């Protein structure tokens, strides 16, 4: 079987830049190779999706150096902002694009930037032979918003690594939110919800990178989103009960999961939510928004039970109410923990995820053979 070139962000192995996308890319590459579909990672450094001229040229040279007809899978963070580079390459390579998150869905973007991302991404995906999304919800959304043939948009959901059951703290009080501190992940909503429950007994860990924010050209500097979240916590008098860890390595993150009683993910947009599966793999119930694919990721168990609580996206009042229910109802907590442990047994492996990706890559190789046969 010939090798697929997998172009990924250069940050894929950087412990200071953990992300669900990087973890997905690395695990899929590893397990695809084990499944007999060789994948060669090609990491490219760059400020993707907004590369410098030199970074854009480096991507162009990497693509130009591949023989005609080479099957190439490109992470959407690298691909979707540079249609001027990807579209010409797609004319001679067998190009697939893996979309972790539509670029325009990242929170905090100005309208004109979001519109530019949408146009660029659409041009790239329409040029590609195949598109891979990380959930059924995301695949349907991508096909609709970019007017793609749904038959070319494939779903490859992430897998989950096995993990020990989390002992927790006291079964109720320790909350864990694992996400980069950005508007899309909704930590401002969580801060407000916690403030409305300040009389309850709890602590919260917000584990994830604290991205910097560039000031507008010629404009005044403003607090980062993380600083604004901290300010809100301070107004409620609860800043000392919330710990921001910054980016964590695997062992440190395992330690935070082990102490967690409830995982909270109040995202405004989400194409999958791998940290939800990672919590459920440890038997930790989840309080999540209903954004995007999160209801699918949280899932259900026997009797239609949900292994956690779902609230409307962007609704701090609903989030506060759900937290109040969690702390105020011991029977509810027992039931949710039991459902989370049942869901744990149903989570799929990365081997299964890689098998799905292998089927897409086989189609990509078949596209190559068909193209060669028409010459």
Model-assigned labels for residue ranges:
Residues 285-288, 292:
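Short hydrophobic beta-strand element within catalytic cores of glycosyltransferases
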Residues 137, 159:
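Carbohydrate-associated surface elements
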Residues 103, 112-131:
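Membrane-proximal helix-turn-helix segments that form the acceptor-binding/catalytic region
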Residues 268:
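Aromatic "clamp/platform" in nucleotide-sugar-dependent glycosyltransferases that forms part
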Residues 247-248, 255-260:
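Short alpha-helical donor nucleotide-sugar binding micro-motif in glycosyltransferases
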Residues 300-316, 325-330:
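Conserved acidic donor-binding segment of nucleotide-sugar-dependent glycosyltransferases
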Residues 166-185, 191-196, 205-209:
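Conserved donor-binding/catalytic core segment of Leloir-type glycosyltransferases
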Residues 203-230, 246:
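Glycosyltransferase donor-sugar binding loop
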């Amino acid at each position: 079987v010939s090798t697929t070139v997998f172009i990924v962000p250069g940050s894929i192995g950087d412990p200071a830049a953990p992300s669900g996308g990087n973890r997905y890319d690395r695990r899929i590459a590893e397990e695809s190779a084990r499944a007999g579909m060789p994948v060669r990672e090609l990491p490219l450094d760059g400020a993707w999706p907004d590369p410098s001229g030199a970074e854009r040229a480096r991507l162009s040279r990497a693509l130009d150096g591949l023989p005609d007809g080479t099957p190439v899978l490109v992470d959407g963070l690298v691909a979707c902002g540079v249609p001027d580079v990807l579209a010409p390459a797609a004319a001679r390579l067998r190009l697939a694009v893996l979309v972790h998150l539509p670029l325009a869905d990242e929170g905090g973007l100005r309208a004109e930037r979001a519109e530019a991302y949408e146009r660029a991404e659409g041009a790239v995906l329409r040029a590609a032979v195949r598109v891979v999304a990380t959930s059924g919800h995301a695949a349907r959304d991508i096909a609709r918003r970019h007017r793609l043939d749904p038959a070319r948009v494939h779903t490859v959901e992430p897998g989950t690594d096995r993990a020990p059951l989390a002992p927790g703290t006291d079964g109720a009080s320790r909350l864990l939110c694992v996400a980069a501190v950005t508007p899309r992940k909704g930590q401002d909503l969580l801060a407000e919800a916690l403030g409305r429950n300040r009389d309850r007994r709890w602590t919260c860990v917000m584990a994830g990178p604290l991205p910097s924010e560039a000031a507008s050209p010629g404009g005044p500097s403003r607090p980062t989103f993380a600083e604004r979240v901290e300010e809100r916590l301070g107004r409620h008098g609860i800043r000392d009960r919330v710990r921001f860890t910054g980016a964590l390595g695997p062992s440190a993150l395992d330690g935070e999961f082990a102490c967690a009683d409830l995982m909270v993910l109040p995202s405004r947009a989400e194409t999958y939510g791998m940290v939800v599966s990672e919590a459920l793999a440890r038997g930790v119930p989840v309080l999540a928004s209903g954004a995007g694919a999160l209801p699918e990721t949280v899932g259900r168990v026997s009797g239609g039970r949900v292994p956690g609580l779902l609230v409307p996206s962007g609704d701090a009042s609903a989030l506060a109410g759900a937290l109040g229910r969690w702390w105020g109802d011991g029977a509810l907590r027992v039931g949710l923990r039991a459902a989370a442990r049942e869901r744990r047994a149903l989570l799929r492996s990365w081997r299964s995820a890689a098998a799905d990706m292998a089927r897409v890559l086989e189609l990509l190789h078949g596209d190559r053979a068909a193209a060669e046969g028409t010459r």
